[in-house]
């Protein structure tokens, strides 16, 4: 579904955006900078939400760089669609949103928006370095290299070797964070894929990406990747468990509160300072 375009228009478009963005103090910042995008306000592919998140922790200059990356990516991916029919640029914006929610830096967010341009368009790594600097180009290159290695075995020993190989290839932790966010959004939109491909990607997610997220201590990614992998690999089991858990949700919460209170009383009786935190297990666990 993807079509390549010559790199010339991409780099020319990005170069034309090197001047600072105009800012109307009578409008909110997100509305001001989004109003200048092609096709605005008809569609922003998630950029309004992204900009609003970025405003909470990045400078205007950093957000302007990310907006330039969006226009560079939109030009590079022009005419490309995902299996769902959505414009392709909506995917890297969603990946960037995941990282913005974690308050990653401007370079990582920029790389997230550009992460598929080298592999899937005729924009080059040199174009990215020229427009956004060597740091962003290095992150995009790192993600592209991870995309080139293929997982082919379900054997646990080989899966572990594959995880070690991926982690060994990474010189910057932000590379794997972009890749994990990329995988998460792909899993969230996996329904548009053929059944066989869904199963393969779900297995790969459970064997490779969820364990890496766990190893890095990114519990949110781990939980979401595991549940989504489970949903697509074992859909019947997932539906049965999901239905059962929804029925018993109230009882589970009461049980967690009760057990937490019992532990807290025991600690107090023994004069032990501590904090007890209870949580409900997610579906895959």
Question: What is the role of each PLM region?
Answer:
Residues 2-10:
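Extreme N-terminal basic, low-complexity initiation segments
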Residues 11-12, 18-285:
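Active-site helical microenvironments for divalent-metal-assisted chemistry
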